[in-house]
Amino acid sequence: MAANNLSYTIAPLEHTPLDEIAAKVDLVRKTFRSGRTKDMEFRMKQIRKLYWAIVDNTELMQDALIKDLRKCKYEAVLAEIDWCKQECIDMVNNMEKWLRDEPVPNVPLQFRAMKHRTRFEPLGVVLNIGSFNFPFQLNLPVVIGAIACGNCVVLKASESSPNCAMVLKKIFDESLDPECFTYVNGALPETQLLLEQKFDKICFTGGKAVGKIIAQKAAETLTPVLLELGGLNPAFVTKHANLKLAARRLLWQKSLNAGQVCMSHNYILVERSVLSQFLGELNNQMRTFFPQGAKNSPDLCRIVNAGHFNRLKKMLDGTNGKIVLGGSMDESTLFMEPTAVLVDDINDSMMTQEAFGPIFAMMAVDSLDQAIDIANTVDPTPLSLSAFGSKAENNKILDNVTSGGATCNDAFFHSQIPQSPLGGVGQSGMGNYHGIYSIRTFSHQRTIAEVPYWADFLFRVRYMPYQWPVMNRMKAVADSKPNFDRNGNKTKGITYFLALVLGLGSKKSKGALLRWAVLVVAAAILEAKKGVLSQLLTR
């Protein structure tokens, strides 16, 4: 039933009683073992019902986001609600295709009768411990992917966005089978007790410190984890960048959700020759974004709570740099203006701590090589990076700086569609999800072979007593020959030259087909011209 009239009042966060948590997990475990969630139509129906629960509770979701983050309705729809709806639709429309058995590629001829393939099978019970900054967009897609793969789910939303946690509970209650998909609300005690239960996958979005604790706890039972953590994400601006667009897009990255985005930049490395111009563009864009000032803007979120506000303020208080953009704040309303600090030391507080807010460092560099060295020193495995430069410069950054994801000439657009994978690398996390990538994350690819009884003669070689003549006959038929020499160089035998001739000089099948098509068309044209010429000569 629709809740868009807001007649429903969001209750204060209700902590799940500790003595109910184990029973909740046991119930969904029992349901999984019954096989109920393995039915494809059941999974699709659950996701469809979830979609309509999101639609029906849209205004309630907006209200919760306003209360928790002062996130405006526009941004709630843009960055949260529509994203979740699209994830539902994309999954329902494609999951049957994505979940089909996949044949094992490159199977030798003598083994093809065995029908080797991989089958996507559900893992079991998935625990998702969510984050506060995008309470719907970072929670529901994990649930959608896990449901699509046939798992049962336990959701633990963040207590730092309590109104959103209660709306998520309502959405679960209204749309999903409670014996398959359940929730736990609470804080540290509830989370600790959850981690004492046995799960088949644990997903966590948040900071490194908690991520390490969860990984250690999961290791006790060899439970796989999906960790989407943060990082000291760099942005690069070279003298060949479009400075106006770079400023506009990077400022947006620190204004969206008040910069409380795990993929937003922590610092910008700017080529010294364009630093002054780039700073001017940043300040121009600030005035464009917030014509009445950032504090008076109805579009700018607030910091989630006093603890995070004070953490950000401490970073600014501890810097030896100079504020060159913004700088205003109001603790009573948790307002903090997008703020840039020009620093000259990679050990500055603005460079060593993850901001996860609207503040960021800027540092001048003399070359792209210097910028790359700094980025690899500050954090060799960030979650994200943004590169603004020429195509060659951007490629050089991609080749020399590792990150979970990267966007050239814009801000974290690599993760702005629900079809692309989101995930970290190294210290910024492990695993990824969204769309088809959720299928691999929340499934076990089980290898299957079906060996027909009649094929036994093909594999006489394996049976005792072993006989060398049988081995030699098999090797004569099936033994692979290397196409490389002892120095590791590729050899060019008759097969290579035959393929080159048949491919008309192209090493790839597409190129060969295109060349043959051109050849056939050219031959047809020549033949037609020849016919016309013959007719003219016979007149």
UniProtKB/Swiss-Prot annotation:
The reaction(s) this protein catalyses:
4'-apo-beta-carotenal + NAD(+) + H2O = neurosporaxanthin + NADH + 2 H(+)
Checking CDD domains in the record gives: ALDH_F14-YMR110C (cd07135)
Q: Which GO terms describe its biological process?
A: aldehyde metabolic process; carotenoid biosynthetic process
> Which Enzyme Commission numbers does its entry carry?
1.2.1.82
Q: Which GO terms describe its cellular component?
A: cytoplasm
- Give one GO molecular function term: aldehyde dehydrogenase (NAD+) activity
Q: Which InterPro entries does this entry report, sorted A to Z?
A: Ald_DH/histidinol_DH (IPR016161), Ald_DH_C (IPR016163), Ald_DH_CS_GLU (IPR029510), Ald_DH_N (IPR016162), Aldehyde_DH_dom (IPR015590), Aldehyde_DH_NAD(P) (IPR012394)
Specify the domain of life of the species encoding this protein: Eukaryota
Sum up the protein's function in the record's words.
Beta-apo-4'-carotenal oxygenase involved in the last step of synthesis of neurosporaxanthin, a carboxylic apocarotenoid acting as an essential protective pigments and leading to orange pigmentation. Converts the aldehyde beta-apo-4'-carotenal into neurosporaxanthin. Is also able to use shorter apocarotenals as substrates (such as beta-apo-8'-carotenal (C30), beta-apo-10'-carotenal (C27), or the acyclic apocarotenal apo-8'-lycopenal (C30)), indicating wide substrate specificity. Neurosporaxanthin is synthesized from geranyl-geranyl pyrophosphate (GGPP) through several enzymatic activities.
**Similarity comment text for this entry:** Belongs to the aldehyde dehydrogenase family.
Protein name according to UniProt = Beta-apo-4'-carotenal oxygenase
To which species is this protein native?
Gibberella fujikuroi (strain CBS 195.34 / IMI 58289 / NRRL A-6831)
